[in-house]
């Protein structure tokens, strides 16, 4: 029996990436964006285009449009949704995750879900730079998926 394993590498040679980032909660999203750009720079990505949208809810439509353009090997969606006193948090978090997943499935281009849903700003700060930077981690996933797709 032959078993073949395929895996994407963490290299940016020849890759073009798009980042869609929400401006809402920019104290946190700016840190996620910095982490992602740092990752792409360290791994030699040739081109990164950043698209800023008002909030996380607006991410999926832009991610889908960018994926359809054929210009990018992967799209990275970055945002922060902080729980408040209303159901708005649940609605936004659920719809954004569905929309980002659909954008990738419909277009066949990896669209990485980098929207963090947190209980409060402190949790957000812990994920966007104080303890670690999830933006860097999500960018690593984008690299891996873009390279894996090239093998298929």
UniProtKB/Swiss-Prot annotation:
Question: Which Gene3D superfamilies does this entry report, sorted A to Z?
Answer: Lumazine/riboflavin synthase
Q: Does the keyword Transferase apply?
A: yes
Q: Which UniProt keywords apply?
A: Riboflavin biosynthesis, Transferase
| Residues reported to bind (2S)-2-hydroxy-3-oxobutyl phosphate | 85-86, 127
Might you report a single GO cellular component term? riboflavin synthase complex
- So where does 5-amino-6-(D-ribitylamino)uracil get bound? 24, 56-58, 80-82, 113
Q: What is its EC number?
A: 2.5.1.78
Q: What pathway is this protein said to act in by its record?
A: Cofactor biosynthesis; riboflavin biosynthesis; riboflavin from 2-hydroxy-3-oxobutyl phosphate and 5-amino-6-(D-ribitylamino)uracil: step 1/2
Please write the reaction equations for the catalytic activity of this protein.
Answer: (2S)-2-hydroxy-3-oxobutyl phosphate + 5-amino-6-(D-ribitylamino)uracil = 6,7-dimethyl-8-(1-D-ribityl)lumazine + phosphate + 2 H2O + H(+)
Transmembrane regions listed in the UniProt entry: none
* Catalytic site positions: 88
Keyword Signal among record annotations: no
Question: Which molecular function GO terms apply here?
Answer: 6,7-dimethyl-8-ribityllumazine synthase activity
Query: Where on the tree of life does the source sit, at the highest rank?
Result: Archaea
One Gene Ontology biological process: riboflavin biosynthetic process
Annotated signal peptide: none
Q: Which PANTHER family match?
A: 6,7-DIMETHYL-8-RIBITYLLUMAZINE SYNTHASE, 6,7-DIMETHYL-8-RIBITYLLUMAZINE SYNTHASE DMRL SYNTHASE LUMAZINE SYNTHASE
Family (UniProt): Belongs to the DMRL synthase family.
Q: What does this protein do?
A: Catalyzes the formation of 6,7-dimethyl-8-ribityllumazine by condensation of 5-amino-6-(D-ribitylamino)uracil with 3,4-dihydroxy-2-butanone 4-phosphate. This is the penultimate step in the biosynthesis of riboflavin.
Name by which UniProt lists this protein: 6,7-dimethyl-8-ribityllumazine synthase
Q: Which organism is it from?
A: Thermococcus onnurineus (strain NA1)
């Amino acid at each position: 029996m032959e078993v073949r394993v395929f895996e994407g590498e963490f290299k940016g040679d020849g890759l073009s990436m798009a980042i869609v980032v929400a401006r809402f909660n920019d104290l946190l999203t700016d840190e996620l964006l910095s982490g992602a750009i740092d990752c792409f720079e360290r791994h030699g990505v040739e081109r990164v285009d950043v698209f800023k949208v008002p909030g996380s809810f607006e991410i999926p439509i832009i991610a889908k449009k960018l994926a359809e353009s054929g210009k990018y090997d992967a799209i990275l969606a970055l945002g922060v949704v902080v729980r408040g006193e209303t159901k708005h948090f649940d609605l936004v978090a659920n719809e954004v995750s569905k929309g980002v997943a659909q954008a990738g499935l419909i277009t066949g281009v990896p669209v990485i879900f980098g929207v963090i849903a947190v209980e409060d700003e402190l949790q957000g700060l812990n994920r966007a730079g104080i303890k670690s930077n999830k933006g860097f981690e999500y960018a690593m996933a984008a690299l891996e998926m873009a390279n894996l797709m090239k093998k298929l």
